[in-house]
Every structure is written in structure tokens, then in C-alpha cells.
Amino acid sequence: MEPYVVDNLNRDDCVMIVWSGEVQDDVMCDLKAAVSTHVKKLHFENLENFTNSSTISSQFHGCSSVILCGWPNPININTLERGLLSNLSSCLQPGGRLICRESTMEDWNSFRKNLTLSGYVNPYQLPGGNHLIFIAFVPSNYTRGSSIKLPWAHSDIEAAWENVDNETSYDVDKNLINTNSLLQKSDYVTPLAACGQEFAKNSIGKRKRACKNCTCGLAEIEATEVEDKSVVSISSCGNCYLGDAFRCSTCPYRGLPPFKPGDRILIPDDVLKADL
């Protein structure tokens, strides 16, 4: 194995070597001796297990931090299709890496596109003479749904409340408003309506009485109200109190609701006028 490939291995790595073709036993022993001294755990799998069945990828799901593919024999370029690359990525831990050696030199840009579509990130090429040797990574945990606090996202809520406390602590009485001083004595006095005007229905005030020398017409209104109070409704036929169903055609109370004898009845002026 190339020395610069071994330099990319760490003591804590769990390495899976995916081999292909016919390999002699002594070659596999030499490869095992060259790699096992630099890593924590090492095991071998045949490439045909990943191409013919997907159960092998589920069996070794996330068990390796590094996959070496193409040793001792370089892998055929036509074998590294997108499906095989996806199966190998499922066997890698988050942040794991795939180190692969191909038998021929292919266009690196087109092959890097296949790596990206298969779920790998940050692929780059290593010097390999007549072979294409590259390293590709699978996304880390933080890119798979976990959250991280942004370094520039600072919360100023506590600082804002601290500033408010500092501004109000030196003189509390000066910054607070006395609610008893909002209303004056004049605000509690019941207002009087202007001469000739009435309060609203929901008002508790009393209407002002007419002046001695009233010129606004309030005196005439009060005199009319006194005359109206003295008028008592009288029915000559005795049916006027019962309603329109019992009244005569010439009854002056037609159109008014039923009433009791002695009630004060005001007939509007427009009732006595002709319609035409």
C-alpha cells in the first residue's frame, strides 16, 4: 500500500478493506500487516457482497470510519457506479471517509459529480501514478439535522433589562406617575347641559331649566310638556285602548300601540296630515 495512503489513517479508525478479484493469501496477509499496525480495528469484505446484495450494507451500517477500496488489486472503473457508492457510504460513520483506487485514469470532474450524487462531500484526488486514488467524506452529524449555535448570534435581552434596571434604580419615585394626580376635582363634577339641550340617554346629568328671560326656546318646550301631561286619553267607544283591531276607521289612535285608560298619549303631527 502506498505510504501517503497510510498517512491518512488514524489510530482510532475502524477500517474496512473491500477487495475484488483473485488475491493470493500471502498478499492479503501483507496488506493486513501494513494496515493493522496503524488502526484500531480492521476487517475484510469482498466487493461482490456490496454489488449483488444490499443486506451486507445494512449489516455493516455505520460500523467503519474508513473504507479502503481497490487494494490489493485496483478496482475496475466500470464497477464504481452510483449504487455501489451509496452502499459503501451507508457503512461509514458520520464524518467517515472513502479511500479508493481505480485501475484507469478517468475524467475526475465527471467522477466527482457521481460522488456528490451518491452522498459524499469534499472529494479530492491523491497522486497515484497510473491509478486514480481519491478520498471522499460522508456528512458529519451537524449536517444531518443537529443544531449548532451561530457564533454571531448574540442575545442582548439580558443587557437590555440590565440597562432598564440601572436607569430606574437611582430614583424610583421620580420615574413613576402618581395615579391619584391624573384626575382633578373638576373632573368629578357632573356636567350641566347647555340651555335648550338634553343629555344623552346613558348620561346621569340633569337638563338645565329655562332661564327667567329665556330666548333659546327652552321655556316654550317646558310649557308644552306641562300641557301634554295634563291631557288624558279618553275613548268614546271604549275600544281605543285595545289596539287597531278594535278601533274605528276614524279613530285618532290608529297606528299606535294599545294603552291603558288614563295613560298619556302623544299623537305625532304627521299622523294628522294627509298622505297626498
UniProtKB/Swiss-Prot annotation:
Protein name as annotated: Anamorsin homolog
Motif Cx2C motif 2 per UniProt: ranges: 248-251
Region (Fe-S binding site B): 237-251
Organism: Schistosoma japonicum
Family matches, as HAMAP family: Anamorsin
Region (N-terminal SAM-like domain): 1-152
Binding sites annotated in the UniProt record for [2Fe-2S] cluster: 195, 211, 214, 216
Gene Ontology molecular function: any one: 4 iron, 4 sulfur cluster binding
